[in-house]
Amino acid sequence: GKVLMIDGDKVELENYGVLYLDDNFHVYTTYGIIEETDIENILVGYNITDFVIAGKKVCAAVISEPMVADNIRVMIMTTGFTSLFHERVSVKATGDYIVKYGDVEEVHKGTEIVDIYPESGYLSMGRISITTVNKEDKITILNVNKSYGNPSYRGDIEIALYDEGLVIINEVPIEEYLYAVVPSEMPVRFGVEALKVQAVCARSYAYKQLMNNSYGKYGAHVDDSVNFQVYNNVEEKDDSIRAVKETYGQVEAFNGK
């Protein structure tokens, strides 16, 4: 299953929940040269790793294919970028949306608000996933304010409970992530050509940070602040979307990296 979180002694897999790692846990790659590698190379958000379970513990992980980066997982911080952890989460959407927890799927009208608290029954079975019925719609987070108001997000939203509070993760295609990074990092008045340069830089940085797996213990790659790249503080603009589309897949590299 897809890796949702990995920490020093446990891993969370989609549809399997949290599994603990054996004291003699090892990680191997089997594409190219077969060799042992580090746990840091198990990337969250991807399903390229097979896990070997014995006695209710994970004793090994086998990374069976190279990673092809398509999605990025972003932690959404509180208003003012003051914390990774939220006291509550309130959502609605621009169209019908689905809240999934455990084996339960609730369908809500876009205008219906769902409130989630740490003690909420929604969280009794682990992470919550929120998806729109129509992939063109967006999910709005009402407990966060950005420069343009309550932010709306492409892709899916996950909510997980930690000791410090709730974390919000937006899983989104990298190209669509850039739609809301480019205008947040550079004023669109600079024009499309300047925005195209920004798009290439932002894409390059996103790929690098995705591979670093910095927030693996929370199930994310980056957050939405200046710690990485500011994301969705300014809403998408036509010119920023155009700049991303016209540079699709282009990255900067130095010495092959």
Give residue spans per PLM region.
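Conserved, single-site charged/polar hotspot
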Residues: 1-257
